[in-house]
């Protein structure tokens, strides 16, 4: 997992390189940035949200202030007010800015963040944290770090509406905590969409109450192929799945970090895990087995059976209830005739 996160972060950094101010290490680099003289020290500074900021923005600001207080060893009290002071760290609603845009201004008197909606405030916070020492991402006090922000004027907004990452948990299962860490890395880099690949031939990872065998049987494969030696298996059962409560928890966690989760239920191919649990959904009746290898399996959902469509309606209905995303991904690829 650590290697995956480091690779993800390194790849994003490399893709964002350019002829920018080497003193400013914000990823992705802002659309407009002016550097000034001097710095502003953030230790023991009051934090103010104007009263027009929404609840999610205020929660994000409170979280930022708490993390800041932890690593600096100081205090950063948060208040909500109709008028924000000229000094300290302030968050001001500016409806002239786009939904995901923000302005971040730092001078000797304080830090002012302006945005119109939650995403803009969130991305401003990410940029602000990247202007601070790396210890800001820690959980222990770092009093010897230089807790100062360079004086800058930033105006930024994303170029692309969809900025996503894909996570396949069917072939390799990730715990809830690992998925959350993945989301954290996405949020740091202002990515806003997680494509969560929850089912495949190698395992079914989401609880469907109407079809309990999907996880009781379909979440576990007997063994996994060793690298590309197709005839050699490790002999170790492998599995795991997420309960619906865990799914809700991840979806909320992601939403609080500006990330929408799009679930993928791959169909009509890539369905060996489901066929193993419910063989009557296949064209041959089986026997089927959760796949322990990679590639494209010949066995798929049978479109000539009414039960297949009842199954899909039941599964997708529960999935829609769990994910507020506008979209559900249904795969549709690599389906042998």
Model-flagged regions — what are they?
Residues 17-161:
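Acidic, contiguous N-terminal accessory segments
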Residues 6-17:
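Hydrophobic h-region of N-terminal signal peptides that target proteins for export
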Residues 10-11, 82, 87, 241:
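Intrinsic disorder/low-complexity segments
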Residues 97-309, 313-329:
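Feature activates predominantly on carbohydrate-active enzymes
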Residues 1-4, 261:
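Positively charged n-region of N-terminal signal peptides that target proteins for export
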Residues 333-336:
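N-terminal leader/propeptide and maturation segments of large enzyme subunits in energy/redox metabolism
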């Amino acid at each position: 997992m650590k290697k995956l996160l480091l690779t993800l972060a390194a790849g994003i950094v490399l893709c964002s390189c350019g002829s920018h101010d080497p003193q400013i290490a914000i990823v992705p680099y802002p659309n407009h940035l002016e550097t000034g003289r001097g710095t502003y020290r953030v230790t023991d500074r009051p934090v103010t949200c104007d009263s027009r900021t929404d609840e999610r923005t205020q929660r994000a600001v409170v979280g930022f202030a708490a993390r800041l207080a932890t690593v600096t060893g100081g205090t950063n009290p948060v208040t909500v007010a109709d008028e924000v002071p000229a000094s300290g760290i302030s968050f001001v609603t500016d409806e002239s800015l786009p939904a995901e845009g923000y302005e971040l201004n730092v001078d000797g008197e304080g830090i002012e963040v302006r945005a119109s909606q939650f995403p803009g405030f969130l991305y401003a916070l990410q940029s602000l944290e990247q202007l601070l020492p790396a210890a800001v991402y820690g959980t222990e006090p770092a009093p010897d770090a230089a807790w100062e922000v360079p004086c800058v004027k930033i105006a930024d907004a994303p170029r692309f509406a969809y900025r996503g990452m894909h996570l396949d948990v069917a072939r390799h299962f990730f715990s809830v905590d690992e998925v959350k860490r993945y989301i954290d890395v996405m949020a740091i880099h202002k990515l806003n969409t997680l494509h969560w690949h929850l089912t495949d031939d190698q395992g079914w990872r989401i609880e469907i109450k109407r079809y309990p065998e999907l996880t009781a049987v379909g979440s576990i494969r007997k063994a996994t192929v060793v690298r590309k030696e197709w005839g050699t298996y490790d002999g170790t059962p492998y599995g795991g799945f997420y309960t619906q409560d865990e799914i809700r928890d991840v979806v909320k966690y992601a939403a609080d970090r500006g990330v929408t989760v799009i679930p993928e239920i791959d169909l009509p191919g890539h369905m060996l895990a489901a066929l193993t649990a419910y063989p009557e959904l296949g064209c041959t009746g089986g026997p089927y087995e959760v796949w322990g290898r990679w590639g494209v399996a010949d066995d798929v959902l049978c479109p000539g059976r009414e039960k297949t469509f009842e199954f899909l309606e039941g599964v997708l209905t529960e999935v829609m209830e769990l994910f507020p995303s506008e979209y559900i991904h249904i795969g549709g690829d690599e389906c042998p005739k």
